[in-house]
Regions:
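Extracellular/periplasmic Venus flytrap/periplasmic-binding protein
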Residues: 1-49, 84-91
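Conserved beta-strand scaffold positions in the cores of enzyme catalytic domains, especially
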Residues: 2-4, 76-78, 169
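A short acidic/small-residue loop/turn micro-motif
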Residues: 7, 185-187
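Extracytoplasmic/secreted proteins, especially bacterial periplasmic and envelope-associated proteins
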Residues: 11-14, 18, 36, 40, ...
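Extracellular/periplasmic catalytic domains that process cell-envelope and extracellular macromolecules
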Residues: 20-23, 47-49, 68-72, 131-133, ...
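Sec/Tat-exported extracytoplasmic proteins
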Residues: 20-23, 29-32, 45-49, 80, ...
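Extracellular/periplasmic periplasmic-binding protein-like sensory domains
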Residues: 42-116, 127, 177-185
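Segments of small-molecule ligand-sensing domains
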Residues: 99-112, 123-177
């Protein structure tokens, strides 16, 4: 079954009931953006008796999800756009919390980490280009090989212009985030 909902919805029972009544699904993929939606959907799915495994987007990578949904998200599997356990991340979190008084791991940590990588990538390309000329920067970006970022080593694929990287797959096990696989996008 494939069902949709509107941004801002908080009651997903009608959609979930249609899915449940279809009886034709092995898992429930929650394509919601943030942990609050994922938590509400998980709670309501379990309330309606949906017992199939839950899959979600990277918005699930938040302690807030466990606070909202508790045992209802035990076993949920989701990908995150970047590695969230790497040297330097703890130091970044400490500095961020000291500066802003807020722990980004609650809801935006992967975006914060990738922003650090993007900044390092851009400043490195400007240095390598020796110029702020957009064409020179573009050429330097495309020539990037093995630049060690916060989350991964960055190398661009010359054919697709995508970054070679690995994507971690997580599962919530007994209220804890556990990395269960590191998927290589270019294997």
């Amino acid at each position: 079954a494939k069902e949709a909902y509107n941004t801002g919805d908080v009651d997903y029972r009608a959609v979930l009931t249609k899915i449940k009544e279809s009886g034709n699904f092995d898992c429930l993929y929650i394509a919601a953006g943030y942990y609050k939606q994922i938590g509400l959907i998980a709670n309501q799915a379990r309330e309606l008796g949906i017992t199939q495994p839950l899959l979600a987007t990277e918005g699930a990578m938040s302690g807030g999800l466990i606070e909202i949904a508790g045992d209802n998200v035990n076993g949920i599997i989701f990908n995150v756009a970047c590695v969230t356990e790497a040297p330097g991340i703890d130091e970044l979190l400490e500095k961020f919390i000291a500066r802003w008084g807020y722990d980004p791991s609650v809801d935006v940590a992967p975006d914060c980490y990738m922003a650090c990588d993007a900044f390092k990538l851009l400043t490195g390309a400007i240095e390598k280009a020796g110029s702020t000329d957009p064409v020179a920067i573009r050429d330097a970006l495309e020539a990037t090989e093995n630049l060690q970022g916060l989350t991964c080593s960055i190398t661009f694929d010359p054919a697709t212009h995508n970054v070679y990287r690995q994507v971690p797959i997580y599962q919530i096990v007994d209220g804890e985030f556990k990395q269960i696989e590191l998927y290589d996008l270019h294997a």
